[in-house]
Amino acid sequence: MPALAFVDTPIDTFSSIFTPSSVSTAVVDGSCHWSPSLSSSLYRIDGWGAPYFAANSSGNISVRPHGSNTLPHQDIDLMKVVKKVTDPSGLGLQLPLIVRFPDVLKNRLECLQSAFDYAIQSQGYDSHYQGVYPVKCNQDRFIIEDIVEFGSGFRFGLEAGSKPEILLAMSCLCKGNPEAFLVCNGFKDSEYISLALFGRKLELNTVIVLEQEEELDLVIDLSQKMNVRPVIGLRAKLRTKHSGHFGSTSGEKGKFGLTTVQILRVVRKLSQVGMLDCLQLLHFHIGSQIPSTALLSDGVAEAAQLYCELVRLGAHMKVIDIGGGLGIDYDGSKSGESDLSVAYSLEEYAAAVVASVRFVCDQKSVKHPVICSESGRAIVSHHSVLIFEAVSAGQQHETPTDHQFMLEGYSEEVRGDYENLYGAAMRGDRESCLLYVDQLKQRCVEGFKEGSLGIEQLAGVDGLCEWVIKAIGASDPVLTYHVNLSVFTSIPDFWGIDQLFPIVPIHKLDQRPAARGILSDLTCDSDGKINKFIGGESSLPLHEMDNNGCSGGRYYLGMFLGGAYEEALGGVHNLFGGPSVVRVLQSDGPHGFAVTRAVMGQSSADVLRAMQHEPELMFQTLKHRAEEPRNNNNKACGDKGNDKLVVASCLAKSFNNMPYLSMETSTNALTAAVNNLGVYYCDEAAAGGGGKGKDENWSYFG
């Protein structure tokens, strides 16, 4: 029987007998026969990314801020943006990072409006489209302010579903178009309804949409007390629904809305109190991510019939609010076969809506209503990109010299298993090799638990078995890439509802990815990983990393199409807070962009404070403890005063920094100031953004 030494000839025999196809010890030449266009196809960028994202000739992701109207010199290299804002000599912001592109947001609004304008004009529809943005999708102040500003020319409004949301919507719309709708949805109490009625006193175009029949009595009573004539809408439960995850809010058993019986009671009560003229809007919602225009047309036609019936009953109807449902193509397939895809364009969606409403209204000789939609996902998803870094990867392959442990002191049973394994290897019998590997490992684990084997012996067997498995091509080729991110904070929908988003390296796209991997986050939670990807993949093509990162450099990944809901839903699991945020406009500068706003992510103090801790008191407690005289065996002499300063500085830095891994040490003054002030503004007017500069105290151009 051969000697039981890991560095003996059997290992060389194994590797010469079996030629592993899935594991190669050679480094793949990533530049050979590879191009950005091949990466674009591999990651489906041309599918989900068009017309806003593309792989450029440098192998980086480019952002096309004006969509299909973007000129070649207006492309923004995403990698250059990341380098600018993370450079210690610049802003020195820490990852993870959200990059917002207001130009993309503006283009999405304009494309949505243009799609409906074209459908209305081409079909001879005798009214107009007037959309609203549901603030629940992303309540960020600057996003909402941008939407109100960008949409002012076509009366674009807001939708609110809670008291804080109606407060922010009212405040923002004071600077918007006075005809813009403020649609008030959600469950309501007297305070909520009073706020909505107060909005009408402020000459805001506020509509109170009844979600429950009981809300009507409050509206009647409070409007009379406040001497305000309300505009009332009602949400109907349609029979039409779709079968996907997001269809659960529709249909007769949906969470929201009124049945036909309840609608008739509302109409009768309004008529009795002389307020039937106040009923002017019908709202419904089939569900988010409507997969096809066929389903959309069915739902809109049903709602249009109900709209016409309300007109017949004497209501002064003016608006049909089709709710959300305008989907985006997360996987780029345009198939509509899952919640990740929709089988239509903006133009096809608008055409289907207009045609359905027009057909029913013409049949009933009813005046065409204003069409409103609440298309939040379609508006904000594209404009925001989450950037994070892979900090390490699981070892792809090991060599025999990685486990040079002498295998001595084993039982006869273990030696027998080894002899069987050796014989199977010499015969080239892969199936038997796997069987004997399992037997050998199990027997050694039992010996370790009983105390008859030491850790060195167990490690030697583990290394031997792992090498054999790789040599016969039976090992799992998928690596684990550890990323500086919290899935629960930044991608909560992946954990919560298995929502998938495109994830792509934002650079090195001119090099062939030589590995496949899953992503594991920083949290101490087994669910903190991403192991499902678009296209039905359970791993992602990635570039190899060594101990110094990706080929000696840093490796950046981007999650795209996550501008809706992810920030609003993110928590602070393990006390990992929100990422840093920058706002980037296309400009005529040398790099084609200007950073117009930067916000450092939540510090450790911020997330502690959110959980009712007092960071200032915690700092003083720890500092005081460090200053107390203590008896210890450390006889080393040192400057005690300087030690106290070092401790205080270390504590302050830990409280003020983000909880994520810090990959670079930065003493940048801007970083320190951001930690203290939380936000910077720059002169957006100088960047072509038309912003007001009186409160803005810095500029940072690419």
From Swiss-Prot:
Gene Ontology MF annotations: arginine decarboxylase activity; protein homodimerization activity
Annotated Gene Ontology cellular component terms: chloroplast; cytosol
Pathway: Amine and polyamine biosynthesis; agmatine biosynthesis; agmatine from L-arginine: step 1/1
Residues noted as binding substrate in the record, renumbered to the chain: 320-330, 436-437, 525
Record site: Stacks against the aromatic ring of pyridoxal phosphate and stabilizes reaction intermediates: 285
Subunit composition and interactions: Homodimer. Only the dimer is catalytically active, as the active sites are constructed of residues from both monomers. May form a head-to-tail homodimer. Homodimer and heterodimer with ADC2.
Record's protein name: Arginine decarboxylase 1, chloroplastic
Source organism per UniProt: Arabidopsis thaliana (Mouse-ear cress)
